C-alpha cells in the first residue's frame, strides 16, 4: 500500500520503495510486486481511515472509494456493516517475498557481497576496521553488513529496540 494509515509522513518512502521494488524486479526479469490494489475497510469515521484519506489527497494517489452498498456488490466475500466504506489504494498490491529475497541476494552478489547460510548470528559489533560478526560458526569481519533479522532485530541489535518494533498484522489475500 502507498496510502498509509500511519500518516502522510510515510507516503514518500512508500512511493520510493515501490519504485525500487519495480526496478529490482525489472533487473531480475520477474515481477516482484503484483499490482492488485490494497483495500482498507472500516466505518467511515474510523481514525485509521483519516490518515489514509489524507495521504490520498495530499499526494493525489489513484484510488477508489466505495460505500457499503458498492462494497457488498464488488466484494461479496466480506461482511460489510451499513456504515463501512472501502478505500482502494490502486498502487497497493502484494509482494512475492521469496522472489524479492532471491533478486536482492543476486544483486548484492553482483556487487561483491557474500552470504553465510544456516548460521546463527550471535552479535554484530562495529569496530574501527569495519564490522565484526560473531556467529555459531566463528567470527567474521566485513567492511559493512546488511542485517535482515526481522523479528529478531531488537535482540540482535538492542540499541535499536526503541526504534524497531515488530507488529503482527492480519492480512487477507483474495483472488478476483
Q: How does the language model describe each region?
A:
Residues 14-21, 108, 150, 169:
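Short amphipathic alpha-helical/adjacent loop interface patches that line ligand
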Residues 47, 123, 152-155:
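Glycine-rich nucleotide phosphate-binding loop and flanking beta-alpha elements
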Residues 87-144, 148-149:
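Helical element adjacent to the flavin cofactor pocket in flavoenzyme catalytic cores
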Amino acid at each position: 500500500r502507498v496510502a498509509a494509515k500511519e500518516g502522510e509522513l510515510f507516503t514518500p518512502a512508500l512511493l520510493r520503495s515501490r519504485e525500487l521494488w519495480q526496478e529490482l524486479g525489472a533487473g531480475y526479469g520477474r515481477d516482484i510486486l503484483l499490482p492488485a490494489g490494497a483495500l482498507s475497510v472500516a466505518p467511515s469515521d474510523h481514525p485509521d481511515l483519516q490518515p489514509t484519506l489524507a495521504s490520498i489527497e495530499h499526494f493525489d494517489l489513484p484510488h477508489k472509494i466505495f460505500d457499503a452498498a458498492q462494497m457488498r456488490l464488488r466484494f461479496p466475500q466480506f461482511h460489510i456493516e451499513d456504515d463501512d466504506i472501502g478505500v482502494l489504494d490502486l498502487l497497493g498490491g502484494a509482494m512475492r517475498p521469496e522472489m524479492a529475497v532471491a533478486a536482492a541476494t543476486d544483486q548484492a552478489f553482483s556487487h561483491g557481497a557474500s552470504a553465510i547460510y544456516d548460521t546463527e548470528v550471535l552479535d554484530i559489533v562495529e569496530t574501527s576496521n569495519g564490522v565484526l560478526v560473531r556467529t555459531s560458526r566463528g567470527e567474521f569481519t566485513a567492511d559493512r553488513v546488511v542485517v535482515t533479522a526481522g523479528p529478531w532485530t531488537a535482540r540482535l541489535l538492542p540499541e535499536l529496540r526503541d526504534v524497531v518494533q515488530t507488529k503482527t498484522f492480519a492480512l487477507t489475500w483474495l483472488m478476483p
